[in-house]
Swiss-Prot record:
InterPro entries: Wnt, Wnt_C. This is Protein Wnt-3. One of its GO terms (cellular component) is extracellular space. GO terms for molecular function: cytokine activity; frizzled binding. The gene is WNT-3.
Length: 123
């Protein structure tokens, strides 16, 4: 009688929240780069160099960018953004739906409304 032993190995992804948090940290510390063109034997070559040499140069594991993100606070027909003017925000939230962030620090108007809704309550 023979016995077999089977081993199965797999790599499990971390939960989605930790991946998002990691990417957000990378995004917040991304390095701005400048495109430089120079002539070499094979023709014109574009290379990236850090825009601010006082900061440490990015590693292979850092995020970099060479174009600024559009400003989503203001309307922009090129990007299709309507801006955040007249959006409803959450006064008590410190997240992305919070008034300070969503209104881009421009302040906000507070409106109180009373509504009557049928709730189909059973007592």
């Amino acid at each position: 009688s023979g016995s077999c032993e089977v081993k199965t190995c797999w790599v499990a992804q971390p939960d989605f929240r930790s991946i998002g948090d990691h990417l957000k940290d990378k995004y917040d510390s991304a390095s701005e780069m400048v495109v430089e063109k120079h002539k070499e034997a094979r023709g014109w070559v574009e290379t990236l160099r850090p825009k601010y040499p006082l900061f440490k140069p990015p590693t292979d594991r850092d995020l970099i960018y060479y174009e600024r993100s559009p400003n989503f606070c203001d309307p922009n027909s090129e990007t299709g953004s309507f801006g955040t003017k007249d959006r409803v925000c959450n006064l008590t939230s410190h997240g992305i739906d919070g008034c300070d962030l969503l209104c881009c620090g421009r302040g906000h108007n507070t409106r109180t409304e009373k509504r009557k809704d049928k709730c189909h309550c059973v007592f």
